């Protein structure tokens, strides 16, 4: 590919960032807002990439406000509220927690698992 970084789409940038990080053969990765500002197809592709990284026993820490997508692919999650950890646990336990729903997720929040 002979394109400059500034001409890549948001999803292409995310995939490039992940590929560049993998070149260093890390044991752990931080993905900051990987689902922000990209189209739904790119979101699904990034979710699949993260799922594959987990299967390779690579630790992945995700910070993102797109809670639905993040909870869908995480094994353990932390909800922050007013700068503190409000709740931690599995996606299912957070999605069903009354306090997490009242203060952060919203009463109508539904957690759907994808077959990635």
Task: Kindly label every feature range from the protein language model.
Residues 29-33:
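Catalytic Walker B motif of ABC-type/P-loop ATPase nucleotide-binding domains
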Residues 25:
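Conserved catalytic motifs of ABC-family nucleotide-binding domains
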Residues 88-89:
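ABC ATPase "signature
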Residues 44-56:
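Helical segment within the ABC ATPase nucleotide-binding domain
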Residues 4-8, 12:
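Conserved ABC ATPase signature
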Residues 18:
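Hydrophobic anchor residue at the start of the ABC signature
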